[in-house]
Amino acid sequence: MNNPISKWHDVVNLRDYNTLTEILDDHVIFYSPVVYTPQRGKDITLKYLMAASEVFNASNFKYHKEVIHKQHACLEFTLTIEDTDINGIDLISWNDSGLITEFKVFIRPLQGVNIIHKMMGNMLE
């Protein structure tokens, strides 16, 4: 079983979008904290994750905790945007080939969700 989490950290730390493309399954499902419906497929997931990378890396984004069990990982992060301390988690699942099949993002507090919604909206326009 291949674990893509170390490669995911490379994507985040280096903004390595080529590696991001390589570790996403073609049928990956992305769950945004600000969009009700799941986003299905590699292309739309790439758009969301690349936009998030630009928004989050402009701040002091940092992972603090990581729990891995079988083919699932929970990564807790913090960042500060517009003087608002934000924390959240990325829940990541992958298949036997080590390709990410599901990516869920949870963020708190509500003020942080609203800020990220606005900034992500600007990036995705």
List PLM regions with ranges:
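Short hydrophobic/aromatic segments of transmembrane alpha-helices and their interfaces
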Residues: 1-2, 28, 82-83
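Short acidic-aromatic low-complexity motifs
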Residues: 2-23
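A solvent-exposed, acidic/Ser-Thr-rich amphipathic alpha-helical stretch
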Residues: 18, 25-70
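Hydrophobic pocket/interface hotspot
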Residues: 19-21, 28, 41, 45, ...
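A beta-strand edge to alpha-helix "cap/lid" segment located at domain peripheries
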Residues: 50-125
